[in-house]
């Protein structure tokens, strides 16, 4: 995987956590999660391998020095075991005193180099570890998954959390597309976060429908600490929130345009666009152009507890995505008792009924839905109560059982 809590860049970390946690609830499944650059603060229900601690160039390092240099999740014994499985001369690579490659983590400018390095290290890990199946999350780790399959002869499952068709509104990056397609071609099983995404994989990447499965995401039960966040009473003015990356995939301009329509009918609603992204400045300008800047707030990127405070402080949550493979945010908002409006172009709509769905481009329908929830207490209450009930039944434990069943199926038919 590429992301894992507590270091969260987006939905990929949240889903990676949920999937591995769901699998860990079955006593006889053991997961080893390979991450470019762990923080050392990851939870202990799975084994973490920091790819930045796996040597690719032989260095003669003594035990005590290793003890002082390695983090708490890697022992000197493990380091030596990996060192015994270096399979080629990588001395031309840029490595540190332990013969390991450094990772920036996240999504740096040299992302393609990091993806390639991750794949090289996967060759060492796949030679040293004992395992039954490989599960690679999103295109960043597909090359590593393919490499691990070639080295070990073990089956490969890939998990499509998004495709470049979603991220780019159709202006596909050929390098990314080639990486995605290669991963899919080599995969024995392709798990897609929605039927919407599954159809994209079959249609745009020419994959056999028989190896593609929809595997919807879920949500984790809220901790007591998050449950205890108070819900302010908004008697005078209501609050409507967009929370996510402010990029073209997420449709932020439709939120601003819908807000402008709502504010023609009433002034006692405030709109919040929380997040960061390459369209932030354009959205601030658009709100000003529409004459609604005094009713619009841009608090920036929210992390951890702030996200849940934002949900609870909202009377309506809106996700107007142009192309959303799944979209975990509305489920989190509904968990917090916040009625949600989602675009019909969102995968999560396949498993949600107690939400209002509009086309992303239909700003009039979106504005009507926002206005209705804000001015009709019985509609608000219905969506609040029934929405929470619906989402509380969508658990990672159930997802874990379904993934487990797919693993067994793949292993049974592998090589036949």
Indicate where each model-derived feature is located.
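Conserved acidic donor-binding segment of nucleotide-sugar-dependent glycosyltransferases
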Residues: 355-364, 372-377
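Aromatic "clamp/platform" in nucleotide-sugar-dependent glycosyltransferases that forms part
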Residues: 322
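Nucleotide-activated donor-binding/catalytic signature segment of Leloir-type glycosyltransferases, i.e.
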Residues: 282-302
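Short hydrophobic beta-strand element within catalytic cores of glycosyltransferases
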Residues: 339-342
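Conserved donor-binding/catalytic core segment of Leloir-type glycosyltransferases
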Residues: 191, 233-259, 384
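Carbohydrate-associated surface elements
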Residues: 196, 218
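Short alpha-helical donor nucleotide-sugar binding micro-motif in glycosyltransferases
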Residues: 301-302, 309-314
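A conserved catalytic-core segment of Leloir-type glycosyltransferases
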Residues: 28-126
């Amino acid at each position: 995987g590429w992301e894992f809590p507590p270091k969260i860049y987006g939905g990929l970390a949240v889903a990676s956590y949920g999937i591995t946690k769901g699998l860990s609830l079955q006593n006889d499944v053991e997961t080893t999660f390979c991450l470019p650059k762990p923080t050392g603060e990851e939870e202990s229900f799975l084994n973490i391998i920091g790819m930045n601690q796996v040597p690719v160039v032989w260095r003669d390092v003594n035990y005590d020095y290793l003890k002082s240099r390695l983090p708490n999740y890697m022992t000197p014994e493990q380091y030596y075991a990996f060192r015994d499985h270096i399979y080629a001369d990588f001395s031309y690579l840029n490595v540190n005193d332990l013969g390991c490659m450094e990772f920036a983590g996240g999504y740096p400018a040299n992302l393609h180099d990091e993806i390639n390095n991750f794949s090289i290290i996967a060759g060492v890990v796949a030679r040293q570890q004992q395992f039954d199946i490989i599960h690679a999350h999103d295109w960043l780790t597909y090359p590593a998954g393919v490499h691990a399959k070639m080295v070990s002869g073990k089956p490969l499952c890939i998990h499509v959390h998004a495709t470049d068709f979603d991220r780019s509104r159709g202006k596909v990056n050929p390098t990314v597309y080639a990486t995605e397609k290669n991963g899919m071609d080599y995969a024995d099983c392709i798990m897609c976060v929605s039927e919407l995404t599954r159809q994209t994989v079959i249609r745009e990447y020419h994959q056999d429908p028989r190896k593609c499965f929809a595997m919807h995401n879920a949500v984790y039960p809220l901790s007591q600490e998050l449950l205890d966040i108070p819900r302010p009473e908004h008697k005078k003015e209501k609050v409507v929130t967009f929370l996510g990356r402010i990029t073209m995939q997420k449709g932020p301009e439709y939120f601003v345009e819908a807000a402008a329509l709502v504010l023609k009918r009433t002034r006692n609603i405030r709109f919040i666009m929380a997040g960061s992204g390459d369209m932030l400045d354009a959205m601030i300008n658009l709100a000003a152009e529409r004459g609604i800047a005094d009713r619009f707030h841009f608090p920036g990127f929210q992390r951890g507890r702030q996200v849940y405070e934002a949900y609870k402080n909202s009377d309506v949550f809106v996700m107007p995505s142009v192309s959303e493979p799944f979209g975990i945010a509305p489920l989190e908002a509904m968990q917090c008792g916040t009625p949600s409006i989602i675009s019909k172009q969102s995968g999560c709509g396949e498993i949600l009924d107690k939400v209002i769905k509009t086309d992303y481009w239909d700003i009039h329908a979106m504005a009507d839905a926002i206005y209705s929830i804000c001015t009709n207490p019985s509609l608000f209450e219905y969506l609040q109560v029934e929405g929470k009930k619906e989402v509380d039944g969508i658990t990672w434990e159930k997802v874990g059982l379904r993934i487990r069943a797919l693993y067994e199926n793949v292993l049974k038919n592998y090589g036949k």
